[in-house]
């Protein structure tokens, strides 16, 4: 993962993306105007619905040319 930056703001889940090959969930979300997605087969995708509508601090980086959540914490 490259170009990792930290963003703080309200998390909004836009849509659930198709599951990975192994059946793990994936989400497209927005944090303070920055649209990003969860990485394939990442455990963060299981915790993301718990943060929906709440203030979070997230590390967002570029993975294969797409903005991807690297880590997330509740503020």
PLM regions with names:
Residues 2-23:
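Structural detector for short beta-strands of small beta-barrel domains
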Residues 10, 26-28, 57-59:
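Beta-strand secondary-structure signal
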Residues 16-39:
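OB-fold (S1/OB) nucleic-acid-binding surfaces
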Residues 17, 35, 44, 64-66:
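Residues that cap or initiate secondary-structure elements
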């Amino acid at each position: 993962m490259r170009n990792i930056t930290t963003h703080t703001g309200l998390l909004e889940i836009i849509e659930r993306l198709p599951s990975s090959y192994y059946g793990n969930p994936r989400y497209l979300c927005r944090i303070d105007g920055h649209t990003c997605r969860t990485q394939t087969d990442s455990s963060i995708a299981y915790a993301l619905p718990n943060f929906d509508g709440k203030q979070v601090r997230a590390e967002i980086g570029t993975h294969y040319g797409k903005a991807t959540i690297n880590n997330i914490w509740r503020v």
